[in-house]
């Protein structure tokens, strides 16, 4: 009888719900949607020792798509942990989760907390997730759903770009110049910079409704001035009109590049001596073109930025960044991103596997920012 009682105590007292995840075992650079499949399973880890998370929402980011294509430098390990025939990984790097249960003795988290993963490659395109270490999760209680789902990539990237490379003098006439001014990161950059007393010159593509878009970027998102790519590449504009826009004693100290090609060289030319250009993306798929004279005679520093690698080197920096952003959202200094997001609903109770897969595929193939929101 004693042995039987001992056996009962050792058995798990909790059971996992059925997990459903979007997995991939291979890659396809031509059509990454073909490698995704929906798979249901029960985790192999012990329920009593694991933190159980219920997914609330996850975005579809360019880095997620690049991982499916097999062209991203950071990828999760494919394993047999999900009871698949071939080693597989769960797609997705970002999302917000609700804590459903915690192991006995866990004091850092409580049931009902909203959390996000500290690191990439955790597999967020799923209805449930388990975690063994509460230290790899960051609490984001108090944020709205869309901010919480996207703060780890776009929010942290924008904040660190503005704050980690230049010591700003808010009493001076100091500027950031950036291309891709309509991107989610750029919109946060202008708001973070405005809160720091730093001005921003945002470059956007030429378009028929340029004036309308520029007005929104300036009035809603805090850009000091918006110009077109044509103006950005026009030497006469830079010589005659740009000084008037910048004002007296202006210092363009930082350039943020996520386009590459001609656009990157044009924003680099606007920097003061010993200025810094940070490249964090390459939308044009063209190489960064920086004039040799800027490097030799102007002391230009051209650096790369990658939030994934920064977090690996210094995890606390991301935790601190999230805390700072949460304070800014709480103080009303940052606009929630919901207005710029395409919502995709995953009705957990009603949608079958085919419907879920089709919805996510549509999100991958659509323009703009898509966030999958789970309806429980």
From Swiss-Prot:
It is an enzyme of class 1 (oxidoreductase). Its EC number is 1.3.1.104. GO terms for biological process: aerobic respiration; fatty acid biosynthetic process; fatty acid metabolic process. One of its GO terms (molecular function) is enoyl-[acyl-carrier-protein] reductase (NADPH) activity. It is found in: Mitochondrion matrix. The keyword Ribonucleoprotein does not apply. The active site is at 72 (proton donor). NADP(+) binds at residues 154, 182-185, 205-207, 280-283, 305-307, 369. Keywords: Fatty acid biosynthesis, Fatty acid metabolism, Lipid biosynthesis, Lipid metabolism, Mitochondrion, NADP, Oxidoreductase, Transit peptide. It comes from the Eukaryota. One of its GO terms (cellular component) is mitochondrial matrix. It catalyses: a 2,3-saturated acyl-[ACP] + NADP(+) = a (2E)-enoyl-[ACP] + NADPH + H(+). The keyword Oxidoreductase applies. Belongs to the zinc-containing alcohol dehydrogenase family. Quinone oxidoreductase subfamily. Catalyzes the NADPH-dependent reduction of trans-2-enoyl thioesters in mitochondrial fatty acid synthesis (fatty acid synthesis type II). Fatty acid chain elongation in mitochondria uses acyl carrier protein (ACP) as an acyl group carrier, but the enzyme accepts both ACP and CoA thioesters as substrates in vitro. Required for respiration and the maintenance of the mitochondrial compartment. Homodimer. This is Enoyl-[acyl-carrier-protein] reductase, mitochondrial. It comes from Eremothecium gossypii (strain ATCC 10895 / CBS 109.51 / FGSC 9923 / NRRL Y-1056) (Yeast). The lineage of its organism: Eukaryota, Fungi, Dikarya, Ascomycota, Saccharomycotina.
């Amino acid at each position: 009888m004693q042995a039987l009682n001992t056996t009962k105590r050792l058995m798990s007292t909790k059971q996992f719900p059925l997990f459903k995840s979007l997995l991939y075992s291979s890659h396809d650079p031509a059509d990454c949607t073909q490698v995704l499949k929906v798979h249901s399973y029960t985790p192999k880890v012990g329920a009593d020792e694991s933190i159980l998370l219920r997914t609330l929402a996850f975005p579809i980011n360019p880095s997620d798509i690049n991982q499916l294509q097999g062209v991203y430098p950071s990828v999760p390990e494919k394993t047999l942990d999900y009871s698949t025939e071939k080693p597989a990984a769960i797609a997705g790097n970002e999302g917000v989760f609700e804590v459903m249960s915690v192991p006995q003795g866990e004091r850092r988290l409580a049931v009902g907390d909203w959390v996000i993963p500290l690191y990439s490659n955790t597999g967020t395109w799923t209805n449930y997730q388990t975690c063994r270490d509460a230290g790899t999760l960051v609490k984001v209680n108090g944020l709205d759903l869309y901010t919480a789902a996207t703060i780890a990539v776009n929010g942290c990237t924008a904040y660190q770009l503005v704050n980690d490379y230049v010591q700003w003098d808010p009493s001076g006439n100091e500027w950031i110049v950036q291309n891709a001014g309509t991107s989610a990161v750029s919109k946060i950059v202008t708001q973070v910079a405005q809160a720091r007393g730093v001005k921003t010159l945002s470059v956007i593509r030429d378009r028929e409704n340029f004036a309308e878009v520029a007005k929104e970027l300036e009035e809603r998102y805090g850009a000091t001035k918006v110009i077109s790519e044509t103006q950005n590449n026009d030497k006469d504009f830079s010589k005659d009109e740009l000084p008037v826009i910048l004002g007296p004693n202006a210092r363009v100290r930082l350039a943020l590049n996520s386009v590459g090609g001609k656009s990157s060289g044009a924003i680099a030319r606007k920097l003061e001596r010993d200025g810094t250009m940070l490249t964090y993306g390459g939308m044009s798929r063209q190489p960064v073109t920086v004039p040799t004279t800027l490097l030799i005679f102007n002391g230009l520093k051209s650096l790369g930025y990658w939030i994934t690698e920064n977090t690996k080197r210094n995890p606390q920096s991301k935790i601190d960044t999230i805390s700072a952003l949460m304070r800014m959202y709480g103080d009303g200094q940052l606009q929630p991103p919901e207005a710029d997001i395409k919502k995709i609903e995953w009705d957990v109770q009603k949608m079958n596997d085919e419907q879920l897969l089709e919805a996510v595929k549509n999100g991958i193939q659509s323009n703009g920012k898509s966030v999958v929101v789970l309806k429980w």
